[in-house]
């Protein structure tokens, strides 16, 4: 559970930390889209350099990014191997029964690997440099135009902020419950698949009870303080779009233009 970084924030004073969450969200969404424009080594090299620039500017240790990558290793390897084994290509370099590995399948597998890693790194930058409540405020502000069609933007923002706030708490509760069960002699690593599934039950039941208790306490606290959502509420911290946020958006626009031009030229 220590590898789960969602909802965790690393305090800092880097330029990435000081940016408006709306600009970081916009760049993150754009990055996920334009990564599919890259189809050769030069395109991925540009994306790698862009990501490395974000990592360096965030002034956060690379170990945090590697920790964020660990929970996804299984999915990444499965996808890469599947792509490598079942993608048809003209230049076959290995063949066994129905399995054929070609140069094209190897290249595609490497590209998919880079896509996963780069997206995870960029999302990790967003998570580690933006407090969860600030991130929720940014999403709420970004969804502001939807108020015109009666979408409850404030309520959605509140739900998101509460969810993000309690992710680290749930992770800590899970770790505490697992340690308590291990102290009672529970072994989560032995047995077949069915036994491993059954061993999760002693974790899930206390975790659900704890979660419902926390939710009830939060609801009572909000009611006792007279909380009322909707328009008219002000925020303690106001989001301010500054020149550095505009530069960040311009950088992703330039990256998009470069990838589009290169895809047409090549």
Swiss-Prot record:
GO terms for cellular component: plasma membrane. Forms a stable energy-coupling factor (ECF) transporter complex possibly composed of 2 membrane-embedded substrate-binding proteins (S component), 2 ATP-binding proteins (A component) and 2 transmembrane proteins (T component). In L.lactis forms a stable complex with EcfA' and EcfT and S components. In E.coli forms a stable complex with EcfA, EcfA' and individually with 3 tested S components (BioY, NiaX and ThiT) with a stoichiometry of 1:1:1:1. The core ECF complex interacts with a number of substrate-specific binding components, including BioY, BioY2, HmpT, NiaX, PanT, QueT, RibU and ThiT. Pfam families: CbiQ. InterPro entries: ABC/ECF_trnsptr_transmembrane, EcfT. GO terms for molecular function: ATPase-coupled transmembrane transporter activity. It comes from Lactococcus lactis subsp. cremoris (strain MG1363). Keywords: Cell membrane, Membrane, Transmembrane, Transmembrane helix, Transport. This is Energy-coupling factor transporter transmembrane protein EcfT.
């Amino acid at each position: 559970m220590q590898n789960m970084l969602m909802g965790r924030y690393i305090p800092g004073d880097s330029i990435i930390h000081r940016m408006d969450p709306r600009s970081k969200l916009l760049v993150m969404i754009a990055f996920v889209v334009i990564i599919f424009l890259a189809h050769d080594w030069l395109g991925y090299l540009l994306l790698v350099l862009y990501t490395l620039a974000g990592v360096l500017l965030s002034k956060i240790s690379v170990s945090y990014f590697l920790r964020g990558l660990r929970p996804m290793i299984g999915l990444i390897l499965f996808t890469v191997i599947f792509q490598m084994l079942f993608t048809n290509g003209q230049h076959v370099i290995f063949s066994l029964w129905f399995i054929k590995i070609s140069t094209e399948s190897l290249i595609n597998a490497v590209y998919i690997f880079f896509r996963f890693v780069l997206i995870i790194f960029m999302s990790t930058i967003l998570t580690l440099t933006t407090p969860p409540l600030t991130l929720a405020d940014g999403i709420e502000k970004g969804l502001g135009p939807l108020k015109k069609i009666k979408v409850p933007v404030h309520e959605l923002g509140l739900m998101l902020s509460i969810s993000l706030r309690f992710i680290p708490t749930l992770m800590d509760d899970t770790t505490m419950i697992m340690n308590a069960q291990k102290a009672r002699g529970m072994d989560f690593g032995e047995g077949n698949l069915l036994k491993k599934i059954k061993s999760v039950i002693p974790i899930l039941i206390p975790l659900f009870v704890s979660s419902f208790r926390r939710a009830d306490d939060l609801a009572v606290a909000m009611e006792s303080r007279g909380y009322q959502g909707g328009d008219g509420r002000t925020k303690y911290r106001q989001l301010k779009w500054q020149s550095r946020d505009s530069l960040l958006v311009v950088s992703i626009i330039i990256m998009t233009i470069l990838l589009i031009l290169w895809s047409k030229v090549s």
